[in-house]
């Protein structure tokens, strides 16, 4: 009776999704450096049966990034990820570009390391996430904690992100045992 008419436990199935990667940064856009982030995302999402159906490389121009996000949504992408431009440098304009799409920003910033500069938002129900650089370098990050929920269409709230503060420090163990460790578990 404590739960009322609601079930005590509700299991949401994860579903393979079509996703977009919007790579940002003048260094990649102008060909000075290779995009090494996208292949990592493709690999991580392939583990869940997801397919990248849209990819665009943008300069550090908020209008161009905004347009690419909107184009990805129009192309039917069910998840949209941006890479680059998520820090606090003056030319890091990706959070502004996401906001300019009209997306509802849930949070920009999280009490999780690695992953403090993570942004999650929803554009007409489609998750748009700004991924910090750590997702490319660290074995496990906030992205790994939240991806299963995104694939299960489980809406992420600011309260959910705040709760990650307890257990939100990955210890970077020499041999990773995640998810069988304290990272992401409170």
PLM regions: where:
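C-terminal and late-domain segments of enzyme folds
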Residues: 184-186
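Short glycine/threonine-rich loop/turn motifs
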Residues: 26, 36, 50-182
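Short, glycine/charged-enriched hinge/interface segments at domain edges or termini
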Residues: 1-53
């Amino acid at each position: 009776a404590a739960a009322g008419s609601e079930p005590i436990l509700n299991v949401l199935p994860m579903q393979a999704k079509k996703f977009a990667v919007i790579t940002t940064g003048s260094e990649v856009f102008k060909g000075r450096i290779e995009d090494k982030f996208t292949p990592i995302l493709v690999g991580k999402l392939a583990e869940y049966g997801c397919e990248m159906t849209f990819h665009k490389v943008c300069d550090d121009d908020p209008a161009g990034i905004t347009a690419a996000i909107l184009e990805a949504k129009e192309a039917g992408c069910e998840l949209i990820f941006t890479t680059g431009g998520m820090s606090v440098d003056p030319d890091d304009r990706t959070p502004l570009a996401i906001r300019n799409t009209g997306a509802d920003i849930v949070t920009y910033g999280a009490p999780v390391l690695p992953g403090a500069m993570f942004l999650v938002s929803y554009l007409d129900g489609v998750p748009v996430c700004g991924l910090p650089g750590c997702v490319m370098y660290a074995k496990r990050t906030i992205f790994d904690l939240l991806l299963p929920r995104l694939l299960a269409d489980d809406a992420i709230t600011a309260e959910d992100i705040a709760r990650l503060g307890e257990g939100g420090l990955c210890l970077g163990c020499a041999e990773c045992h995640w998810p069988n460790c304290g990272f992401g578990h409170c």
